């Protein structure tokens, strides 16, 4: 009876699993003093794993018949390189952008793939560690999908924006880029008054375009992964309800079927979202090289 009395409701379960491990309690929607420690740590660990895997592949690479892992890496590298060549026509820029695109794809794929782990696996382990340290395990928060954190995805998209601005200035020159800001997309006029009006309108449109690209770039990845995380939580609740209810005979069956179907579908989602983010980054960087 005591266990049932303290069992969380469905809403409490979801709210608990959507809480981040943070350095301080967040008091407002936008608070730059808050650091989501779980997203940072998991992201860094996965990044280190990706680097180690590529280093290991490069170390064991052979010019003869490649092994399965080397063949998979070669296919991935060739795919990214082809996409980079299709969007970035400056060979010098591709020396940096192509490896960057490969890194972005693999890193985001690994962060997305954390959603395939059982919902309660790592949070339960963290709760045990947190409780063993003398803290209340009910306040042990941990989210293991960094890309389901808006801070992560907007951080990545902002980094792409910074690179776009850098290449715009590098390729076109500071004067050429500034001229583009006030002459595209509506052009200019020989009349000074109309030229001023068009310049202001063009500048506002350029700012809106940069902001819209950056926000939508990050929000697209976040929205898909956040929704996927919620669906997995709802499926986990089906299993929990089945464990606590003798009358819900079909709940375990529904739990297994729904979980299996969504997991198979989600493999496509996590791969596709990593590819889309990489492709948009390449497209935006390619546009930064072109004159409008």
Swiss-Prot record:
Chain ranges passing through the membrane: 37-57, 96-116, 144-164, 192-212, 230-250, 263-283
GO biological process assignments: proton motive force-driven plasma membrane ATP synthesis
Subunit text: F-type ATPases have 2 components, CF(1) - the catalytic core - and CF(0) - the membrane proton channel. CF(1) has five subunits: alpha(3), beta(3), gamma(1), delta(1), epsilon(1). CF(0) has three main subunits: a(1), b(2) and c(9-12). The alpha and beta chains form an alternating ring which encloses part of the gamma chain. CF(1) is attached to CF(0) by a central stalk formed by the gamma and epsilon chains, while a peripheral stalk is formed by the delta and b chains.
Major subcellular site: membrane
Lipid bilayer topology: Multi-pass membrane protein
InterPro entries: ATP_syn_F0_a_bact/chloroplast, ATP_synth_F0_asu, ATP_synth_F0_asu_AS, F0_ATP_A_sf
Molecular function in Gene Ontology: proton-transporting ATP synthase activity, rotational mechanism
Keywords from the UniProt entry: ATP synthesis, Cell inner membrane, Cell membrane, CF(0), Hydrogen ion transport, Ion transport, Membrane, Transmembrane, Transmembrane helix, Transport
Job description of the protein: Key component of the proton channel; it plays a direct role in the translocation of protons across the membrane.
One GO CC annotation: plasma membrane
Keyword flag Kinase: no
Family: Belongs to the ATPase A chain family.
Cellular localisation: Cell inner membrane
Protein name per its UniProtKB record: ATP synthase subunit a
Entries under SUPFAM superfamilies matching the protein: F1F0 ATP synthase subunit A (SSF81336)
